[in-house]
Amino acid sequence: MKKIFTVIFIFIFTSTAFCEVNKKTVLRAWKNITRAENFSELPMNFESDDEPNAWVAYGDDGDYSVHVTTSLMKILESENEIAGVLAHELGHIQLGHYNNFALSDTVRAIMGANLERADDLAQAVGNINLELKESKFSREQETEADNYGVKVLVKANYSAWGLYNAMKRFDENDLGTEANGFNSHPASKERLANLANQARNQSQENHREKNKDNNNNKKDNIDSLADILMGY
């Protein structure tokens, strides 16, 4: 009986850890990530593209939208991994990395426009549609978004190793050579080492917090029991 239970447990564990990443998985992960940060859930768009990628777009209406390619879903193997990618992208938004691109693109539009009237200026600015898929972040910004992403993963009750494992998929498939979106930079040894270090630290911190909560709960239970006994 014990052997049967062990087999069932292993099956359940592996089936949840390694599952197909489909649209429903992506939407659920995005909802959990944004909820953990009290961030308004942005529209999610799925793109049929041979390039595994994820990025944020900035529309004429001033709103962000998130884009994930079907190829990305194919190479990832768990909800933890897609959650890591989405947490990384949210990091770029929350840390203000897109603001610089928006400002520089506005300046380029104004400088390059034939401004004969004030209306031309308004039109030049109004017609800007930033395809932030083409954004090129610095290594410092990528590291900041990575560190942010790992923290949010734990906060949303995902594995701290989700983003690290996602980057490993890119590395194993020789991806990350296109200068845009999530795969802006190859999964270098330094970047993977930093992600592993962040994941370990967050896992340990999360473990300490849980132990602290458990100890506090035990103390509360003992105090409650003492109060009951004192009442007799």
Task: Go through the PLM ranges and name each one.
Residues 4-14:
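Sec-dependent N-terminal signal peptides
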Residues 98-127:
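Post-HEXXH active-site segment of zinc metalloproteases
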Residues 138, 159-215:
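Long, well-structured alpha-helical subdomains associated
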Residues 115-118, 125, 191-232:
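Surface-exposed, interaction-prone regions with an acidic/low-complexity signature
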Residues 31, 118-167, 191:
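Metalloprotease/metallohydrolase-associated module, dominated by Zn2+-dependent proteases
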Residues 18-106, 151, 155-158, 172-176, ...:
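Peri-catalytic and regulatory segments of divalent metal-dependent proteins
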Residues 20-27, 95-100, 130-148, 182-189:
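Active-site metal-coordination segments of metallo-dependent hydrolases
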